[in-house]
Amino acid sequence: NIKGESLGNVHFAIDYLVNPDSYDLGEKVAIIGAGNSAMDVARTALRKGAREVTVYTHSEKVRASVREVEYAQIDGVNFEYCKSPVELTDKGPIFADIIINEDGEKMVQAGTEKLYPADTTFIAVSQGPKDKIVSTTQGIDVNQRGLITVDENGKTTRSGIFAAGDVVNGAKTVVEAVKFSKAVADAMDEYMQTL
């Protein structure tokens, strides 16, 4: 959690991508995280009128696919590397610089905290699948990556239980996740009609 997550100008990427037309972003947008969802938010924000969009990542590289990053750069998205979010404010996020030592360890550099002005800040930090349901529910199999095993309709190995999203496919684009989730919702509806 980052201090300031509940401010009115701070949003989660997944919420924005569901209905981008309902958001008034302003001209400057900051995005924390650099996965495929962050690229989706960045490109969508530019199309919806933002003039300057910057993606901030804690490492020296971006987690999104090469294709997604290239498209974002073509669209005019800016990238800031080795930044650690300290606090979110109504004037924009505050980041500290991260230095990487010779052993490859990342350390926040004290005294480098700086406000990066933005009208809107998005949190697009990827989150791995949550394993609580698998560890507390019998009959749901997972693969070697810890993802829930499902058929083409999202049915798990336990009767009557369906799954979709990152917990099934890993980190994909929001468009792919929504497409599969809609198919799973249809399969769930069909299943429930037979009960």
Language-model features, listed with the residues they occupy:
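FAD-site-proximal beta/loop scaffold in flavoenzymes
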Residues: 5-26, 103-110, 114-171
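General small-molecule cofactor/ligand-binding pocket signal
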Residues: 11, 78-80, 94, 162
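Rossmann-like NAD(P)H-binding beta-loop-alpha module
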Residues: 24-50
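Cofactor-binding loop segments of dinucleotide-utilizing enzymes, especially the Rossmann-like FAD-
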Residues: 34, 57-60, 166
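A conserved FAD-binding loop/helix module that cradles the flavin
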Residues: 41, 164-195
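Rossmann-like dinucleotide-binding cores of NAD(P)H-dependent redox enzymes
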Residues: 42-86, 195
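A conserved short coil-to-beta-strand element within the FAD-binding core of flavoproteins
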Residues: 82-92, 97-99
